[in-house]
């Protein structure tokens, strides 16, 4: 799994590529999100465009960090889920719980 992090004003964009499945891929994602939140990020957009597969452990990581940020007064939002990843998010109804966007500019603007 490859993860790149960049800042757009007060928003942290986490761009993820690879598989968010049980094991090393999801461990990497969970660790990077925890590190980002512990570093003070309160507004996070996770770009899922490069995720090729997600399972229950990947879903758990997204939900756990969404809840963690919410408790701290922040927010986690999702960006560009595609294909099977979008299907999983729709079936689990996660897209109705966590704000999800197909356009980066709209995701960023949603924090204002």
Can you annotate each of these PLM segments?
Residues 107-112:
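Short, charged, intrinsically disordered terminal tails
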Residues 12, 20, 105:
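Residue-level detector of flexible, active-site-proximal loop/helix-junction positions
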Residues 83, 105-106:
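Acidic phosphotransfer microenvironment of two-component signaling modules
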Residues 20-98:
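Amphipathic alpha-helical interaction surfaces in cytosolic regulatory modules
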Residues 99-103:
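Short acidic-hydrophobic, aromatic-tinged amphipathic segments that line or gate anion-handling sites
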Residues 1-15:
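Short beta-strand/loop segment at the start of cytosolic alpha/beta domains
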């Amino acid at each position: 799994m490859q993860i790149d992090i960049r800042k757009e004003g007060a928003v942290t964009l986490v761009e993820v590529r690879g598989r968010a499945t049980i094991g090393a891929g999801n461990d990497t994602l969970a660790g990077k999100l925890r590190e980002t939140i512990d570093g003070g990020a309160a507004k996070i957009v996770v770009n899922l465009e490069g995720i090729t597969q997600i399972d229950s452990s990947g879903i758990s990581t997204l939900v756990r960090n969404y809840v963690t940020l919410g408790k701290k007064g922040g927010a986690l939002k999702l960006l560009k889920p595609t294909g099977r990843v979008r299907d999983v998010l729709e079936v689990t109804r996660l897209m109705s719980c966590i704000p999800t966007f197909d356009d980066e500019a709209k995701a960023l603007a949603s924090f204002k």
